[in-house]
Amino acid sequence: MFKDHNDPSENPAYTKPVFSRQTEAPVDKAIQRARDFLLKQQHEEGYWVFELEADCTIPAEYILMMHFMDEIDTALQAKIAVYLRAHQRADGSYSLFTGGPGDTSCTVKVYYALKLAGDDIDAPHMTMARDWILSQGGAAQSNVFTRIMLAMFEQVPWRAVPFIPVEIMLLPNWFPFHLDKVAYWSRTVMVPLFILCSNKVTARNPQKIGVRELFTVDPVKERNYFAHVKTPLGKLVLGLERFASTFEPYLPKKLRAKATTKASEWFIERLNGVDGLGAIFPAMVNAYEALDWLGYPPEHEYRRIARESIERLLVIKDDHAYCQPCVSPIWDTGLTSLALQEVNKYDQDDRTEAALTAGLRWLASKQLTDHPGDWRIRRPDVEGGGWAFQFENTHYPDVDDSAVVAHALLQGNNSEFDEHIRRAGNWIAGMQSHGGGWGAFDADNTYHYLNHIPFADHGALLDPPTSDVSGRCLMFLAKLAEQRGDLGTVLEDALTYLRKEQETDGSWFGRWGTNYIYGTWSVLVGFETAGLHKNDPAIRRAAAWLKSIQCSDGGWGEDNFTYHDPSAEKRGRFHTSMAFHTSLALLALMAAGEADSPEVAAGIDYLLRNQGPEGHWNDKYFNAPGFPKVFYLKYHGYDKFFPLWALARFRNERHH
């Protein structure tokens, strides 16, 4: 077991709790019901995948895409419209997450989508949405991506959007803005968008429907499209960009043609079959629309497959439909496997073992080894060995998913996975950034000055190291280090990074799950696997913080608004408990040696009291950011496998 230099194992003040024996029947019964439900959700091929729901921008954009292309499925459009109307807030706006404040950009897109779908603008829900948008300064105040959509639908002039010429594709690597300097999701979204914006492509919009009523000033006369640019660097870049845009008419046609060819070749190489460009909805739509402008007919393989990749994201119910931003089978299968491994740790169940074997074999088959990948630009000498987040995304293995999957394979204790584990260890260790942490898809993606450019008003252009991803990498690599002797420096650097990232209140920030509870869980499970003593000051501060934020009903909950207001008194707090957050807090506290604490007992009781009749839990609220402050997610599996994991660990701690 790897030992940290700050190990206080000789400290006499710490004593491991002695578990008392109480009636375990309710816990055992809850575990059985939750396990049985999960086993029924497994697909024949061995994987699990649950719905991944975003805010209303994605389904609204699906309707907008249909009208952009003049490929309108009226029945589907009607079902999506039902979904959109059902999510309107009482004040007429639309929020980025359940219970959140209204968001101008989201509300503009939904209003436009519903108008395209045939809703009367004088209907009460449309009037309320319009009045709310106008009260916020109108559609001119929406974000860059919304204004680009409005420009393509000819609702605002092109000067309302940043100057993003396709000639960016020809810039040298040393240039301050280069494609390789931004995150994978930015690359895949931007490259086809360069083509669309440089050529000022407009929507077919067969009914010629507009939304001029959403502007307080005539869009042609509006002079305040970039009020969000406030930093000196941002204003400097905006000035340079506005100046450069005046020369666009004089750019040589051959240069534009060369850049367009390079951009189209770049994204066509990464179309990724029926899983789509980057396997994310915004990139897929941009690619689909760019292929149309480039002249590919509807029957062409690229167009056909690009459309299918988008359609595969739809969730169609009897009375409504929505579009997912992506799908999460590898992530869901990896985490479900870890939960079921905890269930089967000491009490072998043949059905569970068979399900685990099938799941792990499916995961092993999805490992990306010698595939091309953008990550190789920063780490050309590292051996491939990661996993994507989606079914297929060969250019973009996900470090976080890879750590979870590799850890599950390692715990599977099956020699058939030895080579997969070896490759995963080499790849994850090789993807460590210089500061000791890990980003999600790239190493050393820390060009923070780029977040000041006008295009980056979303603040999500980059993929820097984060505590949650780093905690899971530590979890896997520390376990692997029990078999390998070449990971000591990697682990020491990771611990140094995570200690530095701890907040003064004892928590850690959660980039990919909400929020400080998620981040703290991520790090504490890594610390536990790394062999840190339970009396380590960092662990004690984290445990004390988790105890301090427990709700009166025994559970835990955290508001997504902590990404907007991260002040200490808001962290780890919400007006209600959630099974997801309760489970994470319990797993974190047990990793900190608190299995016998009254706080853990109360949390377990909360889970027992709130389990549904089918064996799972039903959280109402979103549980992760796609991009903090901009885009949020609800993983529908989180209230199914995390509570099972927590209950199983509690049972195992008390018996062993």
Q: Language-model features: where?
A:
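Preference for long, amphipathic alpha-helical scaffolds in soluble/luminal domains
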Residues: M1-H656
